[in-house]
Amino acid sequence: ANTRSRLRMLTLYYYATINDSIVVGTGNKVEDFGIGFYTKYGDGGVDISPIADLMKSEVFKLSAELGINKEILNAKPTDGLWDDDRSDEDQIGANYDDIEKVMKKIEKGENPDDFDNELKKVFDIYTRHHNANKHKMVEIPICYIPNNLKL
């Protein structure tokens, strides 16, 4: 699936280049900075991420306000990288609404020990994905060479 995502990115950049354009990201705060549900140098390889600071629910509200087609708004979330009908939520193990609830509680400083049993399960899923994908959410580390070692 990562290879498909990276080939998709290459295709998007090809068309952006020949059309003197940019590649616009579709990742939201839950996907990009919550659980890191994207492919590094694949669908995460974009020039601008206009909705990356919006929770998924906020993206839906904005989309409805803009009059986006209901068929699109109600579509099952999928990355389209598999040859079956698995959804994002099937792959993640939790639904986006619950992941967003967990993220909001964490942002408010609430203690996960106080979450109900279902949200505790989602918190565990969120934490597992967040920790495993944290490398995607930080800038590429730079190795600074001391001046006395430079040629």
What are these regions (language model features)?
Residues 1-6, 10-22, 26-151:
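ATP/NTP-dependent adenylation/nucleotidyl-transfer catalytic domains that generate, transfer
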